[in-house]
Amino acid sequence: DDGFAVWDTLAIAEYLAERFPEHRLWPTDPKARARARSVCAEMHSGFSSLRSHCGMNIEASLPEIGRIVWRDQAGVHADLARIETIWTELLAEHGGPMLFGAFSIADAYFAPVCSRIRTYALPVSPAVQAYVDRVHALPGVQAWVQQALAEHDFVDFDEPYRAR
């Protein structure tokens, strides 16, 4: 768009939803749309323990670290409990397969959480694991994963197991 830049994820989501309304990126029902925006805002600003202790890493498989984090970090338990509550309520209310029935911005917002659950093999309920698997299988998420795997930059401090 002629060099127009938007850098905040919620602003990006709103811009895309307005620019491409035919994709119905937000739920059409006003109450569902408000709830979707609310869970996106919560995701945007919350879950700091999960973010701190389970860094985003699409390439790695770190179940051993996940077990240690799960054992030692009560904040991660609290974050995952809240995430499970959000997801199970929305999946039940809207009938799945995504949080608001069809794919929405809310599912995109939670894709990094799904990735962390996979990377660290964090314990979640079967229903939540099924949702994680559905999100991971989305073509857009698969494209994101492939792009991430093609990157070769890393920070030694964040990824000491990769240091050569």
Regions found by a protein language model. Give the residues of each.
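Short, thiol/selenol-centered motifs that function as redox-active sites or metal-ligating centers
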Residues: 6, 36, 107-108, 138
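Acidic/histidine-enriched, glycine/proline-rich intrinsically disordered or flexible terminal extensions
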Residues: 148-164
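Active-site-flanking alpha-helical
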Residues: 17, 113-114, 145
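Short secondary-structure boundary/hinge segments and terminal tails
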Residues: 16-17, 135, 152-154
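GST-like fold's C-terminal all-alpha helical module
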Residues: 43, 47-137
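GST-like domain detector, emphasizing the conserved glutathione-binding G-site
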Residues: 1-69, 162
